[in-house]
């Protein structure tokens, strides 16, 4: 019995359905008894064309292969998506579930919890769906978004490093973006450790979000901020509250803007350039420029009308002389340096810096100040001189340190005080004191401390070859020659007897005619006791001698046991003021009230002091 439904069902593809696979049917009739009949019938058969010997047509087998490969590729892509991408439901789960992973997954930013339903959510539903669709498409096309952002900055740095000259490339980008050269706005600092309050910084390829955040983060550091972003360059003018070096500024901006040092140029601005000041001033009016704080003084000076008027003021030499006189600047280098420092606040100092004859003005100013000081000194008595010099000494000391040291050297203090009184008043043949003794007894320390507090002058016999080595005697109330040797004693014995007598002598001065003066009180220190030298017997009556036989004592910390300081001498003079016959300053007009100093410039009645 046969079954018509028997056979193997096969779903052939298109192009392969010209034949079918058939299975032989089973029959109960056995052929064992019909073998003779089979042989008798011969080779003839009722089935014809059982085997097709014709050429086979190719059909659509190639298209089938392409479809199979496409399906296999889609399956592999789906497996990769399941591995590296998460569905929207997974993105909304708690962060704790994500931490339970075998390998790290790079996901886009997600919410911590499910969004609550509400009216606002329904309004934004269409926008959210559109945004989700765009996010999925972007992720599927480019891979992981955070990974791309992470390598963006590194790619920029690599591009810069590929340049043979990074600075030249940044300068070209800057000029292309802002239309002006970076070096036209700045002055160059060779050292990165030099400090300045104002800095011009330009950066390449900074993210917009970080630029916006820097506007708030820099407020605590800067008094004035000027910011303009012209992609890909960003320009800052930062006026810090305190001076900073290039290294400090670079580290600050690298932390705030997340940039590398190769993306940055930092130099101080040109403070005296009109074009540079106008660039910052007019740029602050641009709506695309962020400016916060008051304009720096150097911008106002060159842009505002009132500052321009002040800048046009002619230089007044008398104002400069008055400044040097009031501050007791007698040397040319001191006058030039300290007056130039006033250029930020003083119009006359600013005019001085803009003048082409600064060296001549400084020289003339120093000459005039010395003339005024010399005239003032000659008018003063020794009491007024000592009083003026002690007023500038600050701090407390004790007069006993001076007295103890004198007694330590086995000197009668009453005798010393009497001779010192005559010495200060410059009495004839009493105006020279010699302190002699072996080395390390404190001779130079004692005399130098006195010269320092009374602003005396020191003469060096090494300059005796010059005709002008005694010239400082004309500009002081007290002088010192330290470490007098036999050669110096010979010179004193031959040429300075009249001066030690207290008589008027002719003193040769450099670049001036010789002048008539009396020697001021003169201190001498020596290892030679001139009183025991018979060949200098003519000096015995002109010199008052004290011996320092004992070595100066020091404590265990190598500190002097006797403090011969300015404060000690101030206390000494104040304590023994009347014993030294120094006049009362109230009688000379100094009653403790502030007095008008010497005026060498024409001041306005209501002008500044």
From Swiss-Prot:
Post-translational modification Phosphoserine, affected residues: 87, 94
SF3 helicase domain boundaries: 411-561
Catalysis performed (reactions): Couples ATP hydrolysis with the unwinding of duplex DNA by translocating in the 3'-5' direction; ATP + H2O = ADP + phosphate + H(+)
Residues the entry annotates as binding ATP: 437-444
Pfam families according to UniProt: PPV_E1_C, PPV_E1_DBD, PPV_E1_N
Site of covalent link Glycyl lysine isopeptide (Lys-Gly) (interchain with G-Cter in SUMO): 518
Sample GO molecular function, one term: DNA helicase activity
Protein localization: Host nucleus
Function: ATP-dependent DNA 3'-5' helicase required for initiation of viral DNA replication. It forms a complex with the viral E2 protein. The E1-E2 complex binds to the replication origin which contains binding sites for both proteins. During the initial step, a dimer of E1 interacts with a dimer of protein E2 leading to a complex that binds the viral origin of replication with high specificity. Then, a second dimer of E1 displaces the E2 dimer in an ATP-dependent manner to form the E1 tetramer.
Record-linked HAMAP family: PPV_E1
Protein name: Replication protein E1
Species this protein is from: Human papillomavirus 17
